[in-house]
Amino acid sequence: TKNTIHLYIYKMIRLIILSDFTEAFAHKLLRGIMEYSRQTEPWAVCRMPPAYKVQTGIEGVLAWAGIWKADAIIGQFNDDDPIELFEKNGIVVVAQDFNSRFERITNITSDYLLTGQMAADFFLRKGFRNFAFYGYKKAVWSDERFEGFRRCLCEAGYENNIYEYNHQPL
């Protein structure tokens, strides 16, 4: 009828971002998520610092997620974090590249081999003949960037002109 009012009720997605917001990546990720939310439907987003996970463990993060009724979490997780606890509680888990990639869950990642190759190409075009790479120990993005950097320089004949420093953990 003409006087019928239609109500559309939707559930607002509640997302926790467990990331280091002192880094540009986390801010850009948040900006992209909020832009997507504006174009589709409103989301509620909780910014959670990694210190919270350090203090309370995954169990503490899960407890907060339960109180807040989170639907999903994007986070910097360690290999030994029991992330399956989120899944068991109906919370979707997405890993932000941090130390390594996860096999069982979705990862936010990049083509780090290509990034390293692009850096090496840049220095080769500038005429450099000796190269150094400053990276971090046991960080997938750093390891793969170095591998792309190294491969490109080896293909150009500079396999003996590369110094790698990766003694500092994140």
Language model features by range: what are they?
Residues 1-72, 82-170:
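Bacterial carbohydrate/catabolite-sensing allosteric modules
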Residues 75:
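Redox-cofactor binding/interface segments in oxidoreductases and associated redox assembly factors
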